[in-house]
């Protein structure tokens, strides 16, 4: 059972060529066959089948199908679903069950989506390889000795391997886009505030956004349209009107389109194969009528440093609530209240989370606040001003999604700084708050996926998806990805 896109699935469902229950069973069977890959932390087998049957009855009874009728979806395990485990891939949330639904989940459910389960991730969304999970790493569907990227590695692998049609992830500095690039799928981070964060476990609140991972731009656009919009439960959500992204997307032409290409994104640290694939695709667009405009973004060298100061500072505050007293893991070795806090956090958090909490606490401490945190905030403002200025002269900024192709499991775990550089091209859009996405455009000499990263102005998701749609390959909806299992 294969579907070229959700539109294909929907037409078959509405014509009664296939049932929601049969579709759900197909995906659940595939999930079961990949059980050893750690892609899902929790599978909603009974709930998904029950939901599918109720949707079949709705259609048979003449009910109006929702915009996502029968779409099989996966949810990253830092997004709340009432009555379901919420682990954030951490020992700290061992045994915790969410008591409410995220706004994004409610909106998807209202349009008749089917939730298959919760996907693996880097612990508390901190990582670029999905190796920082208490449940173990997730292999890349293209090569099971390599990482799928992170922190939404489980969601990316689920879509790429045909274990979900679309998945939700969260993106703080590239956690949707980078794994999308590594797994040969589309990964979209919307404008900050475009999707409500209510129900998303906070990592860095001024950066976090729920994003979409899909096989193609059309499916990503539809899911974004359903989730987008103001929410009274999230004061940072935007009241900016939600357009029909699918319609906006198809109106985008390459003729006269100005594509900004920053020279800083093609420096000597960029893998030669990645550079070659990206430049070839940009040249292809030029031959189809687009104009390539050379840009200079000198602040790019400061992106990683500023980002890790700001997000670790926010993380140290956000994660203070996980103390062993209210919920989650509590150490049995504690003798008193003070040791309960210390031992619960020491035993409950993984190494990378503890590293970031300590970094954040340090940059917020007396004597260092002005030197680090305040300076990083000033750099953030410079980024915002420079990117606004750059996008006055071009329609989109384009470059590689990652400086290198998917790397081997264990290759970078001993060097945190090298791991952090995996997000060097995705972090700027997060610092600025602009929408960005990764679209697959080719393969390196080893057959590993390469993605192009696009950044557009605030709330220009429709235009960005339209540009990406011109880039995606005709076979972009294939299921599943190649695998050496």
Swiss-Prot record:
Assembly mode: Heterotrimer of A, B and C subunits.
Alphabetical GO biological process terms: translation
Enzyme class: ligase
Its EC number(s): 6.3.5.7
Keywords carried by this UniProt record: ATP-binding, Ligase, Nucleotide-binding, Protein biosynthesis
Gene Ontology cellular-component terms listed: glutamyl-tRNA(Gln) amidotransferase complex
Protein name, as recorded: Glutamyl-tRNA(Gln) amidotransferase subunit A
Function: Allows the formation of correctly charged Gln-tRNA(Gln) through the transamidation of misacylated Glu-tRNA(Gln) in organisms which lack glutaminyl-tRNA synthetase. The reaction takes place in the presence of glutamine and ATP through an activated gamma-phospho-Glu-tRNA(Gln).
Catalytic activities: L-glutamyl-tRNA(Gln) + L-glutamine + ATP + H2O = L-glutaminyl-tRNA(Gln) + L-glutamate + ADP + phosphate + H(+)
InterPro entries to which the protein is assigned, alphabetical: Amidase, Amidase_CS, Amidase_dom, AS_sf, GatA
Keyword hit for Nucleotide-binding: yes
Residue numbers annotated as active site: 76 (charge relay system), 151 (charge relay system), 175 (acyl-ester intermediate)
Similarity annotation: Belongs to the amidase family. GatA subfamily.
An MF annotation (GO) of this entry: ATP binding
Lineage of the species this protein comes from: Bacteria, Pseudomonadati, Chlorobiota, Chlorobiia, Chlorobiales
Top-rank lineage group of the source organism: Bacteria
């Amino acid at each position: 059972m294969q579907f070229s896109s959700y539109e294909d699935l929907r037409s078959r469902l509405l014509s009664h060529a296939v049932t929601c229950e049969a579709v759900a069973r197909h995906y659940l069977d595939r999930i079961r066959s990949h059980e050893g890959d750690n892609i899902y932390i929790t599978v909603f087998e009974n709930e998904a089948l029950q939901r599918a049957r109720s949707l079949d009855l709705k259609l048979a009874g003449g009910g109006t199908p929702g915009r996502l009728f029968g779409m099989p979806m996966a949810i990253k395990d830092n997004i709340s679903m009432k009555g379901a485990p919420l682990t954030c891939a951490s020992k700290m949330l061992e045994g915790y069950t969410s008591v409410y639904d995220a706004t994004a989940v409610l909106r998807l459910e209202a349009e008749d989506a089917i939730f298959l389960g919760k996907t693996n991730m880097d612990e508390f969304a901190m990582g670029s390889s999905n190796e920082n999970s208490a449940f173990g790493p997730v292999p890349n569907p293209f090569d099971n000795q390599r990482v799928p990227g992170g922190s939404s590695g489980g969601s990316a692998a689920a879509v790429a391997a045909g274990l979900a049609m679309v998945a939700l992830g969260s993106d703080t500095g590239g956690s949707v886009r980078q794994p999308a690039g590594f797994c040969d799928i589309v990964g979209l981070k919307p404008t900050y505030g475009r999707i409500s964060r209510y129900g998303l476990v906070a990592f860095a609140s001024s950066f976090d956004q729920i994003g979409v991972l899909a096989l193609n731009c059309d499916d990503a656009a539809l899911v974004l349209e359903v989730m987008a919009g103001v929410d009274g439960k999230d004061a940072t959500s935007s009241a900016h009107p939600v357009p029909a992204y699918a319609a906006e997307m198809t109106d985008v032409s390459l003729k006269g389109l100005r594509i900004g290409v920053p020279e800083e994104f093609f420096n000597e640290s960029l893998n030669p194969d990645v550079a070659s694939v990206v430049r070839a695709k940009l040249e292809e667009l030029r031959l189809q009528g687009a104009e390539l405009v050379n840009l200079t973004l000198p602040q790019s060298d400061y992106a990683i440093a500023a980002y890790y100061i700001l997000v670790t500072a926010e993380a140290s505050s956000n994660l203070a609530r996980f103390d062993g007293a209210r919920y989650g893991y509590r150490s049995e070795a504690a003798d008193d209240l003070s040791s309960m806090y210390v031992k619960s956090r020491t035993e409950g958090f993984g190494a990378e989370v503890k590293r970031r909490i300590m970094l954040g606490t340090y940059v917020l401490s007396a004597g260092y606040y002005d030197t680090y945190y305040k300076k990083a905030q000033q750099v953030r403002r410079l980024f915002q001003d420079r990117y606004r200025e750059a996008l006055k002269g071009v329609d989109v900024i384009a470059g590689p999604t990652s400086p290198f192709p998917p790397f081997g499991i264990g290759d970078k775990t001993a060097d945190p700084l090298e791991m952090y550089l995996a997000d060097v091209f995705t972090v700027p859009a997060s610092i600025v708050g602009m929408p960005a996405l990764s679209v697959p455009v080719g393969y390196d000499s080893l057959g590993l996926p390469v993605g192009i990263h696009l950044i557009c102005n605030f709330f220009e998701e429709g235009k960005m998806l339209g540009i990406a749609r011109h880039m995606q390959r005709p076979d972009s909806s294939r299921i599943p990805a190649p695998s050496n299992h």
